[in-house]
A protein has these predicted regions:
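N-terminal intrinsically disordered, cationic/polar leader segments
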Residues: 2-161
C-alpha cells in the first residue's frame, strides 16, 4: 500500500493575501525543474528559479507586494507560502528521505546545507552576507525568507556559507 502512495501526485497550490501582499504558489515535487516566478524582485526571482531547476521540481510563483516600501513583506510571505506548499505537497512524506545534505561550490562561495524533514522547524543560518541590495533584494531578507520557509515547511535547516 505504501508503494502506491509514493506514486500519488505530490502537488500543492497555496495562496495568502494580507494588506501588504498577495502570493500564490503552485508546486509539483515530482516536476521537471521548470518554473515561472514573478515576485517583482529580480534577484529573488533568479534564486527561486535556480532552486526549482536544481531541485527538479516545477514551481510557479505569482507575488505582488508593497515593494515601493521595501521587499520585506513580499520576501517573507513568499517564504511562508512556499513552506506551506512544500508541507502540503509532501503530505505524509512517502518517498522522501528525512535527512539530506550538500556542499555547493559556486564561484568564490562554498555553501553547506543540511536539512531534517522532521516536522520540527528550526533555522541555523551562518553567513556573512553584508548589507545592501542585489537586484532589488535586500540582502538581510535572505535569512528571513529561509526562516519563513523552514517554519512553514516544518523542516530543520542548517546553512553555512
Amino acid at each position: 500500500m505504501n508503494e502506491q502512495k509514493v506514486l500519488l501526485p505530490r502537488k500543492a497550490t497555496v495562496s495568502r493575501q494580507t494588506k501588504e501582499t498577495k502570493v500564490e504558489i503552485s508546486l509539483d515535487l515530482d516536476g521537471t525543474g521548470e518554473s515561472r516566478i514573478q515576485t517583482g524582485i529580480g534577484f529573488f526571482d533568479h534564486m527561486l528559479t535556480l532552486m526549482a531547476r536544481h531541485g527538479l521540481f516545477t514551481l510557479e510563483i505569482e507575488a505582488a507586494g508593497d515593494l515601493e516600501v521595501d521587499s520585506h513583506h513580499t520576501v517573507e510571505d513568499v517564504g511562508i507560502v512556499l513552506g506551506q506548499a512544500i508541507a502540503k505537497a509532501a503530505g505524509e512524506k512517502y518517498g522522501i528521505r528525512r535527512y539530506g545534505q550538500i556542499y555547493v561550490p559556486m564561484d568564490e562561495a562554498l555553501a553547506l546545507v543540511v536539512l531534517d524533514f522532521s516536522g520540527r522547524s528550526y533555522l541555523a543560518f551562518e553567513a556573512e552576507l553584508g548589507q545592501g541590495r542585489v537586484g532589488g533584494l535586500d540582502v538581510e531578507m535572505v535569512e528571513e525568507f529561509l526562516r519563513a520557509l523552514a517554519d512553514n515547511a516544518g523542516i530543520t535547516l542548517h546553512i553555512r556559507m
